[in-house]
Amino acid sequence: LEEKIRLESAHKEFLANMETLSDLEYRKEMERLGVDLSWKSSQIEGNTYSLLETERLLKEKQTAQGKTKEEAVMLLNHKDALDFILDNPDYLKELSVRRLEDIHSILTKELGVGNGIRKRRVGITGTNYRPLDNEFQIREALEDTCQLINGKENVFEKALLTLVLLSYIQAFTDGN
């Protein structure tokens, strides 16, 4: 309970601080966050761009030498997904399978990854974990996840549940 109170207080402080930012300051802060999130998320997917190379790509559209086109596309897609979410702040207030699929399609655009819930088995490199392999069970797990998250009030609880459950379900062939 004490931790929950601290988190709620931190969230209120964050919102108050955000209100003091000008539009330009807000955009700059979101740009910085976008670079960090794009870089780290893409690293998890095996991308070899450095943080500095990612920043150059996202800000100046300058690709890094010795890197593949797919790595650049992956990073640019992460930026596009974050921009979409920032430009449509209410879009994910209530999660749905369709909205998750929409964000996934932005993340995987031009990467040769099929859209929609996967229809085949996947493995997680370096683990023995085997996610659900039936499209209907995956959809049901996603629907249950959306319902659970939509029923929560606390933004931190929602974020943690989203991260953990979507990672666990591995609903898409790639780009989870």
Question: PLM features: residue spans?
Answer:
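FIC/Doc superfamily catalytic core
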Residues: 1-174
